[in-house]
Amino acid sequence: MCGIVGFTGKQQAAPILLDGLSKLEYRGYDSAGIAVFDHGNIKVKKCKGRLANLVEKMDEEGKPQGHVGIGHTRWATHGEPSDINSHPHGNKRVTIVHNGIIENYKKLKDFLVGEGYSFASETDTEVAAKLLDYYYDGDPMKTIAKVLSEIKGSYALGIMFRDFPDEIFAVRKDSPLIVGVGEHENFIASDVPAIIHYTRDYYLLDQNEIAVIKKDSVKIYDVHGNEIHKELNTADWDVDAAEKGGYAHFMLKEIHEQPDSVKRTIMPRIMDDMPDFSAEGFNPDKLKNYKNIYIVACGTAMHAGMVGKYIIEKIARVSVTVDIASEFRYRDPLISEDDLMIVISQSGETADTKAALELAKQAGADTMAIVNVKGSSIAREADMVVYTHAGPEISVASTKAYMVQISIMYLIAFELAYANGKMDEAECSRYTKMLEEVPEVIEEAIALESKCQFAASKLINADSLLYIGRGLDYALSMEGSLKLKEISYIHSESYAAGELKHGTISLITEQMPVIAIATQKNLEEKTISNIKEVKSRGAFVVLIAEPELDIEDGVADIVIKLPQADQLLMPMVAAVPLQLIAYYTAVLKGNDVDKPRNLAKSVTVE
C-alpha cells in the first residue's frame, strides 16, 4: 500500500522519481507527489489522481530542478484523497513521505497544536513531519531517534532536511523499505521494481534502522547512532520481468508465465522424484509429530491455503485449520508448541499475516512462511521459509503467485503423507512426477483463452454472479469469485454447491449467471444436480469441467472442458480459465485491469 522512492545522484531527480513511482503503481494509490532540493529549498509538487495527473501538473508548472528528492504514491488511510492530503508533507525545514499508520497521531497532533503548529491536511503523516520539525536541533539522527520514540504504529519514512541538501534519511518499522546502491547514485524504495532499471543491489532495512543516503555513500545506524554493517542483496530477476513484454496487461502476461513459474518453484524441491525441503530446514520426522496444522493468510493466499487444507487432509490424513489472518489473530486461537503454523503471503509484508505469525511464535509453535519476496519481513521472522519463484507480480490481481503457492502446498502434502506412512515411496514418487508434468497441462489450459473470452462476453452485463463447487472445486470457486470482483467490479459470491438449497438459491434469476466447477469425479453427480437446480430457475450457466465428464444437453450454456490431469491436481489446471474469464470480463468492461480501484497489491497496514 502506497509507494516510496528516493534518489540522490548526478542526474536530475524528478524524472527518476516519476519513473520509480510508475513502477510502484501496482501497489495501489489515489494521489502522488515528489519533493526535490531545488536551489537551496525543498520544492514540492503533488496532486490527487493518477501519476499522469502529476506529470501534467509539472508540465504546466515546471519540474523541480535538483539531484536529490523523494516521491510517493498515496493510498488513503487518514483523510480523503485530495491534493492537500497527498504526500510529501512538511515545511521549509523538513519534508517527508510515509507509508503506514501513526496510531497515536491524534494525541501528538493535539500536543503540536498546543505548541503553536497548524495543520493543512487530515493526515497522520503531516503530524510526523511537524513532530520532526519540533524536535529538530540541527542533528537529523538525534531528531529522528527522538521522533521514533514518540510515535506508535507502522511506518516507512523518507525524510529530507533543508540543512542537509545532499542527503536522504530513511527509516522503517513494520512497513517495507529498501536502499538501492548504484554507481554515484543511491535510492530508497518500497520495492525492487522501482529501482531495477538503475541497480540490482540493495540493502534491506530492519526495524528502526536509520539509513543516511548520499550519492556516493550509504550508512545505516541503529537508533542509538551505532553504525550497522549489512549484507548487500542482489535482485535475481531480469529487468524485463517488470515490463509487459508485448502483452496488453501485466495480468495476462502473468497468466501466461504460470507454467515457467511453477517449474522454477517446484524443481528445486524435488530430488529423485520425491519432495525435498531439506534446504528449507523442513524435518520430515518432526513433521509427522505436529498435533495440528494451521494455514493462515489473506485474500488469494488464503484461497491457496484452502486448496492446501483439502489435499493435506485427503492424502496425509492430518487435520488442517485454515484461517483468515485478520480473524485468527484476534480470536485467542488454541495454538501451542505442538503445532505448525504455515503462513502464505506473496509480498511477505501482509500486516495481518505477519501479526498472526508473531502470535504463533509467542505460543511456541513452529512456523513456516511461503513467500515470493526474498528478505521480506515475514520471511525473516519465520522458522522455515519456502520461497516461491514466481518473479515480480505486478498486476494487483494475483495469478502466478496463487499458482506457485498451490504447487508448494502439493509438495508439502506429499512430504507429509510420506512421513506419516499414508503414502509409500512409490506412490509419493508417482504423485510428484505428475506434479512435475502439470506446467505442460497449464499450457494447454491457457490455450482455452478464446473460449474463456467468449464466456466473459456473456457476463459483462451481469450485476451479480454465483460461483459453485464441491470439495476442491469449492476452494477454487472462492478464488474465481474473488478474481472477478477484484477487476470487473461485478459482485460475485462463492458457495459450496451443496449449500444452495439452504438459502442462496432464492437469489437465482435469469439475471444471475452461475459459474460451476466440476473437476472431482466422486462429486460430479452431486454438482450436476446442483447445476440443474440453478438452470431450472433461469440461470445462465458456465461449466468448467474435467475432460471426461459426460454432460447432458441443456445442463450448461457454455462448457469449458479442461485438459487431462489427475483430479487431485485439477485446481492448478482449473484456476487458469477462472483467471482468464475474470480478465476478459474486466477488459470488455473497459476497466483498468492491472490497477483496479481501491485495491493495493501489498496490504501493509491492518
Name each model-derived stretch.
Residues 49, 67-84, 272-284, 308-344, ...:
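Glycine-rich oxoanion-binding loops at beta->alpha junctions
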